[in-house]
Regions:
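Hydrophobic positions on the alpha1 helix immediately C-terminal to the Walker A/P-loop
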Residues: 25
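Post-Walker A helix-loop "phosphate-sensing" segment adjacent to the P-loop in P-loop NTPases
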Residues: 32-41
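Conserved catalytic-core segment of NTP-binding enzymes
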Residues: 110, 117-118, 128-214
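Walker A (P-loop) phosphate-binding loop of P-loop NTPases
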Residues: 18-19
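C-terminal lobe/tail of nucleotide-utilizing enzymes
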Residues: 173-277
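Conserved lysine of the Walker
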Residues: 22
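Single conserved hydrophobic/aromatic residue that forms the stacking wall/gate
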Residues: 1-8, 12
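P-loop/Walker-type NTP enzyme "switch/lid" segment
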Residues: 15, 45-117, 227-231
Length: 277
C-alpha cells in the first residue's frame, strides 16, 4: 500500500467554502486515481446533506452509510458502494438523517484502519463546507490535504482558516510528526475574468495562502452537465475540465505536467471580424 506515513495508505481531504466545487473535485480526483489503477475509496463527511452519492450517480444504491458502520449496525463491506465507472473505486455515503455528533473520532479512525487493511491505496475524504464537526473529522486523519478554493476573496479567506485548523488540529499536528502535505486547487477559474479584473489571479491566491499549487480547474458548464448526469466530470471525454483533473492526479502521483487553463488567449483579428468569441 502506498502512503506518506508508515501506516499504510494516505488519507486525503478537501475543504473550502460551500459551492467552490469540493464534492465535484473529490469525485473526479478519486475517479482519476482509480482510472490510474489505484484502489480508491471516497468518503462523504457531510452528515445531513449527503451529495457525493448524487454526483457519483449511486444515490439509489445507498442502503447503509458511514454512521451505520460507526454504530456497528452494518459492516464496512455492506456500506461501501462499488462505482459504476471504475471497478477499483468505492463510495462510503454520509447519513442524511443522523446527528453530526454520531461522527466520532474513534469511529472514523476504525473505518480508516479497516480500509487500509482491506488494501485501499487512497482514501479521499470529502469534507463539508466550513469548520463544523464533519470538516474537522475529515481533516483529523489526513496525510495530505487538497484545499479547494475559488479565486474570490471570501473563499480564499475561508481556505486560510482551514489551513490554520489543519496545522493545529490534525493528528499529525497533535503528535508532532511530519505535517500534513498541503496542495492548492483553484476551481471555476476564468483567465478572461482575471484579465478584466473581476477575479483574483492564481498568483494572487498563491501569494495569500502560500501553499503549492496542484492545479487549476477552468470555469465550465460541463461540470453542471456531468453532475446532472451523475457522472464525475473527469469522465467527460475531450473536455478542458476532465483534462485539468487528469493533470492534477498526475501531479499528485509525482509526474510533471505543464500548467494549463491559466492564461487568457485573446481572440485573433479574423475571429473578431467573423464574430468568434
Amino acid at each position: 500500500t502506498q502512503g506518506v506515513s508508515s501506516a499504510a495508505s494516505d488519507v486525503y481531504k478537501r475543504q473550502g467554502k460551500g459551492g467552490v466545487g469540493k464534492t465535484t473535485s473529490s469525485a473526479s480526483f478519486a475517479s482519476g486515481l482509480a482510472l490510474r489503477g489505484k484502489k480508491t475509496a471516497v468518503i462523504d463527511f457531510d452528515v445531513g446533506l449527503r451529495n457525493l452519492d448524487l454526483i457519483m450517480g449511486c444515490e439509489r444504491r445507498v442502503v447503509y452509510d458511514m454512521i451505520n458502520v460507526i454504530n456497528r449496525e452494518a459492516t464496512l463491506t455492506q456500506a461501501l458502494i462499488k462505482d459504476k465507472h471504475c471497478d477499483n473505486l468505492f463510495v462510503l455515503p454520509a447519513s442524511q438523517t443522523r446527528d453530526k455528533d454520531a461522527l466520532t473520532e474513534e469511529g472514523v479512525e476504525r473505518i480508516l484502519e479497516e480500509m487500509k487493511n482491506s488494501g485501499f491505496e487512497y482514501i479521499v475524504c470529502d469534507s463539508p463546507a466550513g469548520i463544523e464537526r464533519g470538516a474537522v473529522m475529515a481533516l483529523t486523519f489526513a496525510d495530505e490535504a487538497i484545499i479547494v478554493t475559488n479565486p474570490e476573496v471570501s473563499s480564499v479567506r475561508d481556505s486560510d482558516r482551514i489551513l490554520g485548523i489543519i496545522q493545529a488540529k490534525s493528528r499529525r499536528a497533535q503528535t508532532g510528526v511530519e505535517p500534513v502535505k498541503e496542495h492548492l486547487l483553484i476551481t471555476r477559474y476564468s483567465p478572461k475574468r482575471v484579465e478584466a479584473g473581476e477575479m483574483l489571479s492564481y498568483e494572487d491566491v498563491q501569494e495569500i495562502l502560500r501553499i503549492p499549487l496542484i492545479g487549476i480547474i477552468p470555469e465550465s458548464e460541463s461540470v453542471l452537465h456531468a453532475s446532472n448526469q451523475g457522472t464525475p466530470v473527469v469522465h467527460l471525454a475531450d473536455s478542458d475540465v476532465s483534462e485539468a483533473y487528469k493533470d492534477i492526479v498526475s501531479r499528485f502521483l509525482g509526474e510533471d505536467r505543464p500548467l494549463r487553463f491559466a492564461e487568457y488567449e485573446k481572440p485573433g483579428l479574423l475571429s473578431r471580424i467573423f464574430g468568434g468569441k
